[in-house]
Amino acid sequence: MNPNQKIITIGSVSLTISTICFFMQIAILITTVTLHFKQYEFSSPPNNQVMLCEPTIIERNITEIVYLTNITIEKETCPKLAEYRNWSKPQCDITGFAPFSKDNSIRLSAGGDIWVTREPYVSCDPDKCYQFALGQGTTLNNVHSNDTVHVRTPYRTLLMNELGVPFHLGTKQVCIAWSSSSCHDGKAWLHVCVTGDDKNATASFIYNGRLVDSIVSWSKEILRTQESECVCINGTCTVVMTDGSASGKADTKILFIEEGKIVHTSTLSGSAQHVEECSCYPRYPGVRCVCRDNWKGSNRPIVDINMKDYSIVSRYVCSGLVGDTPRKNDSSSSSHCLDPNNEEGGHGVKGWAFDDGNDVWMGRTISEKSRSGYETFKVIEGWSNPNSKLQINRQVIVDRGNRSGYSGIFSVEGKSCINRCFYVELIRGRKEETEVLWTSNSIVVFCGTSGTYGTGSWPDGADINLMPI
């Protein structure tokens, strides 16, 4: 090959290589642009699709790194779409309850700006648990805290914080309410918020941060709801609401709500005579509630809710060791499953219980007459056998010498089962403690455990003499 042919050959090869490189660069550019726009396609859900995002939740997306010659392209995959909760897993087998959380709100109020509250409760979304309470529109170290023993004022609002975070000045006020319930359907929070005049109150239904529906008092006598979490199954949430006498016949309705809209209302049926302040839990495919009879019984009413046909059945907890306060002593108390026991029926306190096969787990004040102390235990055949009194696995949560208050249940879904947890309201101040002019609370929270556990007492712990007056 002569020199001219060599030059021509080398030139042709160089031109071919340059052309190939040119087309490769074009291909790389097209791939980069395509992946960039695909990323935005994936990250934009339909307008009617609610993503599983709360202000305190950080979505962590999996990142794929693709290398093309010298260029690095990052492709973010779409977050998994939120799904409605169905609560179809079995209930966890437990041996008792272990300490979970305590907010120490009253002790912290001695030296900080903490809200005055009452009627606390706990509820969880699929990722985190939150504590709620009805605030009094003031902090404790504030003259507006005087006379906050009154429970229905236009200044009361529903407060919401991550569990364990006391209600400080930065706390979110979810809605205006002197009675409330909250639950998460897997996609967003539903808040049921009652406020207004005693004889003409309004219940607002707030879903995903927006007011969706409302309903007016139907009996014109203090419309009220659970003061603990409602329950949602497959996108339908249910909440128990009562309007009418607190010491006589009242009108209880069970509301069914989808994304904040009331879709059905059922009237209480069955043998329960008086139902309010229910503590509800998912019992797939339905919902079960254990409530307060403020009229005839110190045994607690049960409300079973059918989420498919909206039917309601009610009766009473069978355990002869009854759960309300006031009550007779254990040797004299009774319950026969169907009717109120007509023992110390007037007044009462919010509480909870849940079935475990034929047995029942329950909590109650240690004192038979006042909201003092708190204990939990299991009653063998207490769910199915009238007047059962065989108690096992008793635990003291708050000793008899310290104050307690309302208590309620909430459920937490684990990998293989649904755990039951409870909170206890630790009331301080008026009426019992007249050294101060305010009434407020802290909380302590326990959850079911299949492990072992010790003993103790977890009272509020604030020295009333060190508190602001």
Model regions and ranges:
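A short beta-strand motif characteristic of beta-propeller blades
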Residues: 165-167, 213-220, 264-267, 314-316, ...
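Single-pass membrane-anchoring alpha-helices
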Residues: 4-38
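Blade-level signature of beta-propeller repeat domains, shared across WD40, Kelch, NHL, RCC1
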Residues: 437-469
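Short, aromatic- and glycine-rich surface loops/edge beta-strands on solvent-exposed regions
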Residues: 192, 239, 420-428
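Structural motif
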Residues: 200-204, 249-253, 297-303, 372-378, ...
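N-linked glycosylation sites
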Residues: 61, 70, 86, 146, ...
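Extracellular cysteine-rich, disulfide-stabilized repeat modules
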Residues: 289-291
